[in-house]
């Protein structure tokens, strides 16, 4: 794909013109360029903790998908919490699984009677560079932050803490970026929750040692898996996997004709087989390994195509470098389509790629949970995932999909699915029902309400 990008830093927008074929252009905007004023500085206090607008949602709309019993249980749990003031604090409102979850969770909390808000902390590029390094180190990367980067992280947390309004019943802090808020201003909420969305099973020892004093005393903390809980947490620890919203444009039912039409607009030959991975362009997601798997498959199935589809997040400056590395690894192959939101790939387009693909892949080498797994399986398509993190929670190997440990295994399973269409259909059908039971938003809302009730009673 040839990219011609015209970027305006002052206005924070990018226009991308894309034509079919392999992606061979490079582009790397700074997150500060399109999320924060270039001359903002720390003196622009009015821009700290920006509220995020969300559309309204109605819990009853999920009854036909999740069942009456769960909906009734949620309303019963919400009754004593009506009128409670709840704040979600995160690093970004754009890109990544956390923001996608909150665009559904916040309006549903409002629908059941909570006064719920979502606020995004202020940070410039120096902050996001430090927190991206922290994110990788907490998932096992060897490089820790230097003292200047730790000081940058603390300084921005202190600034945001000063501007956080008080009198919250619950303040729910997402991930390490704003994690210091509870230690800095505990008096601004009666109940505090730290929600960790990443894999802390084998963190860099220096990094977790620096972070632990800021997270250890949260009254409640939530992790995707028990293995992710670091030693030393003093409050109550909860294991709560995230979930997807089946009613969003990304996950709603899409006809085969519509899916094929959308894919065709991006240069996909809809009459040829397609492998697809939807994820951030991040080393842990291993898009380079997916390309390697595709090449093995293509030796046996010359018509095979590959789509790598990702959203570039505003708190991920390193992502653009790896996006360009992925393009380089594709080496100009016209059947490798590397796409992101700057190619006008939005929720409907992701839905189309997932619904149309013959095999869906998430070949992560480290993974906090991997919501793209449940999103993919919800489309009832055959799925292959890396045997890491939260992916095995969503996949029963050989029953609802396949778990793999290498590019070669991924290619082997892909070839099995292509050779037996009935196998792919049965994997997809069983996978969809597994997601319906365990990984849809109403279940996630129920788990949060239980925790809020515990905080209220304590």
Briefly describe each language-model feature range.
Residues 373, 382-385, 395:
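Short hydrophobic beta-strand element within catalytic cores of glycosyltransferases
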Residues 264-285, 291, 306-307:
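Conserved donor-binding/catalytic core segment of Leloir-type glycosyltransferases
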Residues 365:
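Aromatic "clamp/platform" in nucleotide-sugar-dependent glycosyltransferases that forms part
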Residues 310, 314-352:
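Nucleotide-activated donor-binding/catalytic signature segment of Leloir-type glycosyltransferases, i.e.
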Residues 423-438, 444-450:
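A short, well-ordered alpha-helix in the C-terminal region of glycosyltransferases
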Residues 370-373, 391:
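Short glycine/serine-rich donor-binding loops of glycosyltransferases
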Residues 44-85, 103-167, 240-246:
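A conserved catalytic-core segment of Leloir-type glycosyltransferases
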Residues 397-408, 416-421:
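Conserved acidic donor-binding segment of nucleotide-sugar-dependent glycosyltransferases
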